[in-house]
C-alpha cells in the first residue's frame, strides 16, 4: 500500500493529529485494510449492506472505515490552535471528499435507513461539511433523515 507523504505545520501539543491524518489517508486511499472479509462486513453493517461482490465490499470499507475515523478522531482534528487553521481546513477538505465517495458508492438504502453506518456518518458530519461538497443524493437523504 502506498501512502502519499504530506508536509504540515502543527503545534507541539497536536501530535495526536498525525495519527488522524495517517488514518484519513488510508481510509480515503480506498484501502481495503478495514474489515476486508465480506461476510463480516454484512454482519457489522447490517443486512442492507451485506454483499460478497468486490465493489460492494469496497463501498462498505468506506462506510465503516470513515465512521470509525469520525467517531474516534475527527473532533480532535478540529481542536488545533488558530495558527494551524490551514491544517484544519486541509483535513476537513479531505474528509468531506472521503464521505462524498461514501455516498456515491454505498447502496442507497444504507443512506436512507435510520441507524445505519452511513446515516451516522452523514449526521455526524452535518456541522462540519457544507452541502456543496456533497452530491444531490446526500443532500436529499440527509434532509429526509432529519425531517
UniProtKB/Swiss-Prot annotation:
Membrane topology of the entry: Single-pass membrane protein
Q: Gene Ontology terms, cellular component aspect? A: membrane
Location of this chain's protein in the cell: Membrane
The UniProt keyword set, sorted, is:
Membrane, Transmembrane, Transmembrane helix
**Regions crossing the membrane:** 13-35
Share any extra remarks: Partially overlaps YIL067C.
Specify the protein name. Answer: Putative uncharacterized membrane protein YIL066W-A
This protein's species is: Saccharomyces cerevisiae (strain ATCC 204508 / S288c) (Baker's yeast)
Amino acid at each position: 500500500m502506498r501512502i502519499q507523504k504530506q508536509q504540515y505545520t502543527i503545534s507541539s501539543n497536536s501530535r495526536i493529529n498525525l495519527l488522524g491524518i495517517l488514518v484519513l489517508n488510508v481510509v480515503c486511499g480506498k484501502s481495503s485494510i478495514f474489515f476486508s472479509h465480506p461476510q463480516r462486513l454484512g454482519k457489522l453493517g447490517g443486512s442492507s449492506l451485506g454483499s460478497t461482490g468486490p465493489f460492494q465490499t469496497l463501498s462498505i470499507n468506506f462506510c465503516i472505515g470513515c465512521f470509525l475515523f469520525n467517531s474516534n478522531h475527527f473532533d480532535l482534528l478540529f481542536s488545533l490552535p488558530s495558527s494551524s487553521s490551514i491544517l484544519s481546513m486541509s483535513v476537513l477538505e479531505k474528509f468531506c471528499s472521503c464521505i462524498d465517495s461514501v455516498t456515491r458508492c454505498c447502496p442507497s438504502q444504507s443512506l436512507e435507513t435510520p441507524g445505519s453506518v452511513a446515516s451516522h456518518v452523514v449526521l455526524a458530519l452535518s456541522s462540519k461539511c457544507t452541502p456543496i461538497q456533497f452530491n444531490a443524493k446526500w443532500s436529499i437523504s440527509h434532509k429526509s433523515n432529519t425531517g
